[in-house]
A protein has these predicted regions:
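Nucleotide/phosphate-binding sheet-loop regions of phosphoryl- and nucleotidyl-transfer enzymes
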Residues: 1-379, 404-407, 411-414, 421-426, ...
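Acidic, glycine-rich flexible loop/linker segments
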Residues: 371, 379, 387-403, 407-412, ...
Length: 526
């Protein structure tokens, strides 16, 4: 999926970093070959890498001008967050110094290296991700700063040493310095992640065959974390929650893509209007990077016209130059699916028949998502972003396993997390709703919740969660595990106790689609 779309974007004349795709057939060979890459494939990878070197005029592992790559998975059907991504591969103790010299930016070089150690250790060496986050959090506490962006080169240097010590302690090995070993390790890990518990769960929930396998995309890195003329973002060509025909997305200045999706920093809006609607003080991309925004808006329209569907797009801006990293059909709510399908017929992008075929009948019951009864008094304790519509009430749980356990006992739960990760999929499926303290409208929690039709409130920074004591604080309120709360994914409000709901009105778009469906049914019957 991802590799084919990258090639397609290149053909449309859009700026795509050079790279290559290892196909799903290789995944099959990998499993047949006792989970090892066949020699022939390794040779192919090396010659493809030479092509990237030619195009970028950089060399892999070079001590003057090192090539860095990203390694990502690409399944036939997008499985958001199910497979693993590694950025900045090709950095080691020596190439990081070369990168610092080339860019005259020591902070950027060290920040990129610590991110690589973090991702590689987590994905390839199986060191728990939160151990690295804790090291960073403790370091920030001692230094008295709030944000990762407040740390300078010497801070990251110290943390790199701590990270390497952590790997040694956990895995009894030194962090790999050989760039070829790094690359093959990363490719192996992507193939292995196809067999991970979370990927299996997602496939089971979405009827995706186990034998399909995943592809791997290797691509030259472009950097969104070099400074303030750099950024990274995720955007949808229309609103995936409501279906409105307006760009919907988020970006972060001086960041890498993972920061937006993982929800570690709560991002800024892409359009000025969205920023104003949300009452946000931070500059939108349209204001902060007007020239790049204009170019991006053109790309959105071009991609939507080409694929004739709402696209979910990842991009990076390096020194004010736009690069497209991926495009795919975006996950959307049932309500959005109907509105987008009807609108696209009106815009002459698709036919009525195509519009009907695009509606997944299994999701139509979510149109009947209950909404909160306006007449009832509500005790609002916090608010966040309205990430996935609908109202839900249930007992507060802090882990995916607990949500699944209570669901088995026919009890409704609301899963409350700092941010969700792909490991939480089973619990998100079991819970009635999801509440996260961090992350935006394009974070993992938001995208997966919309696809599942689960109400979700994300980025509720007013709540502080304590996993140890199993409680969260919202202002003066303390909510313990097992207490009942209600969330409204349409407004972003979090309420104490059980709030009664009412059945919603069916929209005009729904009746339009049903009318068209009837026309086709009659044609067939006659």
């Amino acid at each position: 999926g991802k590799g084919a779309n990258l090639g397609e974007m290149g053909r449309l004349g859009l700026p795509v970093p050079p790279g290559f795709t290892i196909t799903t057939d290789v995944c099959d060979l990998f499993y047949k070959n006792k989970k090892k890459l066949p020699k022939k494939i390794v040779q192919n990878i090396e010659s493809e890498l030479k092509n990237i070197e030619k195009k970028t005029k950089k060399k892999f592992g070079d001590l003057k001008n090192p090539l860095l790559v990203s390694v990502r998975s690409g399944a036939r059907i997008s499985m958001p967050g199910m497979m693993d991504t590694i950025l900045n591969l090709g950095l080691n103790d020596k190439t990081v110094e070369a990168l610092k010299k080339r860019t005259s930016n020591g902070r950027f070089a060290k920040d990129s290296y610590r991110r690589f150690i973090q991702m590689y250790s987590n994905v390839v060496l199986n060191v728990e991700g939160h151990l690295f986050e804790e090291l960073i959090d403790n370091y920030k506490l001692t230094k008295g700063v709030l944000l990762d962006t407040d740390l300078d080169e010497s801070d990251w240097d110290g943390l790199i040493t701590n990270f390497k010590e952590l790997v040694k302690k956990e895995k009894k090995i030194n962090f790999p310095q050989d760039v070829k070993e790094q690359l093959l390790g990363a490719i192996n890990a992507v193939f292995l992640s196809w067999d991970s518990q979370r990927a299996k769960t997602y496939r089971k929930l979405n009827q995706i065959p186990d034998h399909w396998g995943t592809a791997v995309n290797v691509q030259a890195m472009v950097f969104g974390n070099m400074g303030n003329d750099c950024s990274t973002g995720v955007a949808f060509t229309r609103n995936p929650s409501t279906g409105d025909n307006s760009f919907f997305g988020e970006f972060l200045i001086n960041a890498q893509g993972e920061d937006v999706v993982a929800g570690t920093r709560t991002p800024q809006y892409i359009t000025k209007k969205a920023k104003q609607d949300a009452g946000s003080k931070d500059q939108s991309m349209e204001e902060a990077m007007p020239k790049v925004y204009k170019e991006l808006a053109k790309v959105f329209l071009k991609l939507e016209k080409h694929y004739k569907d709402m696209q979910d797009i990842e991009f990076t801006v390096e020194n004010n130059k736009l690069w497209m990293l991926q495009t795919r059909s975006g996950k959307r709510t049932a309500k959005a699916a109907i509105k987008i399908a009807v609108d696209m017929v009106k815009e002459k992008l698709i036919s009525k028949k195509e519009a009907i075929l695009r509606i997944d009948p299994n999701t139509l019951d979510t149109l009947l998502h209950p909404t909160l009864d306006d007449k009832v008094k509500k005790e609002i304790i916090a608010s966040g972003l309205p990430a996935s519509p609908g109202a839900a009430s249930g007992k507060v749980v802090f882990s995916a396993d607990e949500a699944e356990r209570l669901n088995g006992m026919m009890q409704d739960t609301i899963l409350v997390r700092l941010e969700t990760s792909p490991e939480d999929i089973h619990g998100m499926h079991a819970a009635k709703g999801i509440l996260t303290a961090r992350g935006g409208m394009t974070s993992h929690a938001a995208v997966v919740a919309r696809g599942m039709g689960r109400p979700c409130v994300s980025g509720s920074s007013e709540i502080t969660i304590d996993y140890e004591t199993k409680q969260f604080k919202a202002g003066e309120e303390i909510i313990k595990e097992g207490d009942v709360i209600t969330i409204d994914g349409g407004s972003g409000k979090v309420m104490k106790g059980l709030v009664p709901t009412v059945q919603p009105e069916i929209s005009g778009y729904f009746s339009t689609i049903m009318k068209w469906a009837d026309e086709f049914r009659k044609l067939k019957v006659r």
